[in-house]
């Protein structure tokens, strides 16, 4: 059986900000998996736990896997996105600062490990009911696209490219990285979604010959950036479509009860959709990802050489 080597790093013991890195194996390639960069991350933490339990039962690993189940301990405990200590969102300050605030020092310590990894998988729990999907800079970088296309989830969605995000900064540094956003409520675990993501990641490890087992070739639809559908009136929103369904501009996706229909202004696929609830004018009730119908795996990316990879560590 493979035993985890635990490395506990104290960022700020007074606030309980200690990062626990669990390493399985010591060889290359290395995969870094992290979860809970914010509160409301119960499902992605559980998925990382399931991956660790699987690795512990293996006889050997040809490579190494490092797992950080809770990347932002204080925010995770409080169920918040922004730290109450410095008003910073961890996933907006990478690569961090060794001498900075608690959140910046946390990002710096994670970045130290991330910059040495061969692959990075960032687990997140969606704040709206969603299809579990990959988010990555797959249109800009072929090293990212190659990983995104090997994670056996239905969609790989182009990320926003926000600077300071781990997904953006690592991709710019030449590191193959994807985020996985999964179904789950803020304070409850969606065990089915956690298992689905665990299986997708374990299959990726098999494709890279890190662990043994049957390999499943993935079929991933690449999409552009997510588009939001907002409501223009207040009331009870009732969805009239299902997650994963294709939509065209003008299709009805739901209604504001006793008032009006909510239509999609975009073509694409429904990736996230609000359950029936009370909404206010301007609220986001769904997100649509436009399919890249003209994509061919053999095509080079125009911007692949526009940014030279540079490694800081």
Model-derived features: where do they sit?
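Structured catalytic-domain cores with a bias toward divalent-metal coordination
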Residues: 1-313
